[in-house]
Amino acid sequence: MTLKELQIGKSAIVDAVGGAGALRQHFLDMGLIPGAEVTLVKLAPMGDPMELRIHGYELTLRLDDAAQITVTPTEKTPAVHAPVAEKMVEHPGLGEGGKYHTKEGEHPLPEDKTLTFALAGNQNCGKTTLFNQLTGSNQHVGNFPGVTVDRKSGAIKGHPETEVTDLPGIYSMSPYSSEEIVTRQFIIGEKPTGIINIVDATNIERNLYLTMQLMELDIPMVLALNMMDEMRGNGGTVRINKMEAMLGIPVIPISAAKNDGVDELVDHAVHVAKYQERPGRMDFCSEDDHGGAVHRCIHGILHLIEDHAKAAGIPVRFAATKLVEGDPRIEEALKLDPNEKEMIEHIIVQMEQERGLDRAAAIADMRFSFIQELVAQTVVKPHESKEQLRSNRIDQFLTGKYTAIPAFIAIMGLVFFLTFNVIGLFFQNLMEMGIDALTGVVDTALTNWNVNAAVHSLVIDGIFTGVGSVLSFLPIIVVLFFFLSMLEDTGYMARVAFVMDKLLRRIGLSGRSIVPMLIGFGCTVPGVMASRTLPSDRDRKMTILLTPFMSCSAKLPIYSLFAVAFFPKYAGLVMVLLYFTGILVGVLAALLLKSTVFKGEAVPFVMELPNYRLPGLKNVAQLLWEKARDFLQRAFTVIFGATIIIWFLQNFDLRLSLTVDPQTSILARIAGDIAPLFAPLGFADWRISTALISGFMAKESVVSSLLVLFGSTAALTAALTPAQAAPLLVFCLLYTPCIAAVASVKRELGGKWAAIMVVNQCAVAWLCALLVRLVAVAVF
């Protein structure tokens, strides 16, 4: 039978994994190997995908992919909770013996050499928390060479001679996703002096799969065993010294969230890097396992490729196992001649016949077999964790068949309600009061000092009116990002992807696409960047092109201004309708793209469902500060510049003389040439055209431009009717995103796709606004 036919609550043993290429390798890397026991936990509310439990963690899989995996039903193996016969052996300090501790006669690296570290680990293992604990505020953000994946680096606190780079969260070193490719290229290409591998102690079997591949790179390495507080709290423990002896690298128990053990981790990391103490073990295949087939295969290939690996700068053990797996990138990098390729292929075929497994499955089985032996000897299994039980109870509601969709709508509705009507609104009002008070003080001072009228106008009408009106929306943006980051860090966003996968597949997307698009409600730029986690190029492009339809928070000032001014009784309803309009148009655009440019099926949905956890306040605060800082930088650079330029163009004519009549200004002349394009939409006013142009620089500047040009909200309401305001709102909702978002799309997809997106968004906005105009004329 196939995994697709397994009943809910039943278990089975995997017999064979079908499929081919990178996807099949990804299945194997995630633990779906012959001989593994899987249990079907449940199906998504819409019947697809399924949730499995394997190697102690939850994995999602579509039914179509499950149909390619053959299984044999079995009774679920009861969990064995060995009694904790001894306390966990405390980890020895430096100099107390062991391969990786201080030895006489060593030759450390020069004192002036910067110790560079790669921080690597699975997703949801606490890597970001540890990075923040290690670096504090000593962080800077860049990009990995040649790609658009963010690169966060920083010096370890108290160690200015170090630099640690936070690598993307990955499950293996196979080239399945852009994150895995980036990690591999960084470690092999930049050759850090050390690796800090963080492992989730509560999910140790899956996490150690990456550890074994990192050890094959022959780079000094320490293992940070994170969440040990949870492990102990559930009655489990780890025999640290025994694990160190079996792995040949330092193992340090830590709790990144509580900052426990981090100082010791830093001491060991600096030590192994300074003295270049490499892993004491890289060979994980036993000579006795199935006649030593895998052992002979790997060692035979090692001798054949040693010179090629050295010339290519690739660790030979890593290159050998990747060749056995069938990694095309490694094979290409080694530049083997035809005779060598034929000999290697012969060795691999011989191994497959002796082992009874194909090449990729044999390597995956070798790794998991060693992990099982390691865990059996070093880990005292805890009782079912409190975190797992809590997650199961929460999931009964949040991913339940009849409750998942209503819960999602309610949660997102609550987020927007609290953001726009309660918390965000409260702080926004405080900010506005402060800005108004400061404006009054400055205005009075300038008047008393008899400052030149032009300068007075620039400061009050230009800077304070423009930038001040935008700054007042900072609280709303920060509050919205707070809620979205909380939902993501707790693990709920992964559940949303699980619940929504079947629905999104109907419009040509994967359930994973929901996360970038939801982030797009906060800001299009991080939404576009979040698409990097999607393994399929097709899904990435579609998601990026659709994300701008999700109304970003920078447009809130526009909605708020027009909704309150023109539809005061229905302001809240108008704003909700705008958001749903953006979603509806995005769905229609997706269906069009699916049937034209991006034909084909969405990428398979293979994803881990982590336990629910409350994110650390320090991590959330760090994220919010980064978002607020980014907004403030834009407010005082792009928006500040746009405000001054618009003020200048509005107040001077072509002779550069101060103008009394705004219609004779430079701005009026430029905008007047564009205004006829908007005549069918009902707002052929040069001032509105100007504001829309400024919105391309930053959406926040639309409001500031309108207030500068019209002089006040009252003047704006006098100039427009509700039948004109409605299509204008829809146009603002859908037309091209700001230049920062366009630049993000250009970085991700190239200039061609960015230009196509700008043109398409403007065309769609114009057509939808025209439709709304026709309806509005009939209604109002």
Go through the PLM ranges and name each one.
Residues 1-80:
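Compact, glycine-rich, soluble single-domain proteins
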